[in-house]
């Protein structure tokens, strides 16, 4: 692995000149293709949890960006569409039944998944878009018209509801993508962006928008935090009142309650949001 990282780091230093060196380019392209395949298999990840905190593998981001630099756009076709892109689809018209059965996933018409994306077993992909570098863990549902951004990390047994946007990020290199940990529910038409972490078991109501500067308010105490939804929180949209009468309030999101793991498992999402 260290030699692989070294090769990517060296190529990154001369990225603006790569296309001028055909011999080096051939070798690098093979390395990049191998990395993209490792992302497909989930053996390499853009972001990993280490000792209870998330760590960005910047070299993997660099590899993806180098892949864009060194790859020419091609024409792709399936049975009902054609497109012109640098990134191949993970699944194409040539993907056979056995491939899907072995992967143990379900993918319906209209679902677009770019190569370099990991899709674990028992994932259901409705018509949606999943970008390169994303990681979707076991038992998760990506619902209709959801968008999973580049490098976004989605945990096990999550439900990403219809029309939801999960932000991704390739640059800046050190920036974390959005991370949705295990057993989370993200309500319809919500948007989670700018590296926000939604911790395990959290429930996000419909129509909630959270970025790095969004105020996240504990309803009980008034405490305000940023960039992180604590584990097993139930979150709804809200407004912070203005300090001066007659002035407009400002949007925030509100943690209305926090439940334990047992309650989260037993109680329906609708009951938690009431």
UniProtKB/Swiss-Prot annotation:
* Pathway listed: Amino-acid biosynthesis; L-lysine biosynthesis via DAP pathway; LL-2,6-diaminopimelate from (S)-tetrahydrodipicolinate (succinylase route): step 1/3
Write out the annotated subcellular location.
Cytoplasm
Say if the entry is tagged with keyword Transferase. Answer: yes
**What is this enzyme's EC?**
2.3.1.117
The protein's assembly and partners: Homotrimer.
- Give an example GO biological process: diaminopimelate biosynthetic process
The cross-references to CDD domains, in alphabetical order and at most eight, read: LbH_THP_succinylT
Task: Give the record's keywords alphabetically.
Answer: Acyltransferase, Amino-acid biosynthesis, Cytoplasm, Diaminopimelate biosynthesis, Lysine biosynthesis, Repeat, Transferase
Q: Gene3D superfamilies, from UniProt?
A: Hexapeptide repeat proteins, Tetrahydrodipicolinate-N-succinyltransferase, N-terminal domain
This chain's protein is named 2,3,4,5-tetrahydropyridine-2,6-dicarboxylate N-succinyltransferase
Amino-acid positions noted as binding substrate in the UniProt annotation, renumbered to this chain = 106, 143
